[in-house]
A protein has these predicted regions:
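Leucine/isoleucine-rich amphipathic helices and adjacent mixed helix/strand linkers
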Residues: 1-153
Length: 153
């Protein structure tokens, strides 16, 4: 926006807008290529990457790596968390084709750049059409774990 304000003429503003549009399309192409790399992985790895991205994109707040690991470790139609299904932090990063980063100080897992978030806000349904249903199933399963039957943990 500051770049547009600094333009002295109408022609300069139009040119700056064209460069901005090309930049957004270029970023979109980069993210599409990353998603194609994810789709080219084996089915289990691809599904894990889709779940990781789905959780990050739909979360109302940043997730810690532990929270994401536990969300990914929940299996539907189970009554407890099996820690054998918790993916490592290295796996969280590696299966997502460079789209996910972890902050070692804060323990937060996030998309690699704010433009990545913007891209997925525009396109998530085409990449992850079942993400909300999946997240709902996992949340219901988690809340149904035996540990919660006796009340608060």
């Amino acid at each position: 926006m500051n770049n547009l304000i600094d333009q002295p003429t109408k022609g300069d503003i139009k040119q700056a807008l064209q460069h901005l549009a090309k930049g957004i399309k270029g970023l979109d192409k980069t993210y599409e290529q990353a998603m194609e790399r994810i789709n080219d992985q084996g089915s289990h790895v691809r599904e894990l990457a889709e779940h990781i991205l789905g959780w990050i994109i739909h979360a109302k707040r940043p997730l810690s790596t532990v929270e994401l690991q536990h969300a990914l470790g929940v299996r539907t139609r189970t009554t407890k968390l099996d820690e054998d299904y918790l993916p490592s932090i290295r796996v969280l990063r590696s299966v997502c084709a460079g789209l996910v980063a972890t902050d070692e100080q804060s323990g937060i897992v996030r998309l690699v750049h704010y433009t990545t978030q913007q891209y997925f806000e525009r396109t998530w349904y085409s990449w992850f059409p079942n993400a909300q249903t999946y997240i709902t199933d996992i949340c219901v399963t988690y809340l149904s774990f035996d540990v919660f039957k006796t009340g608060f943990c």
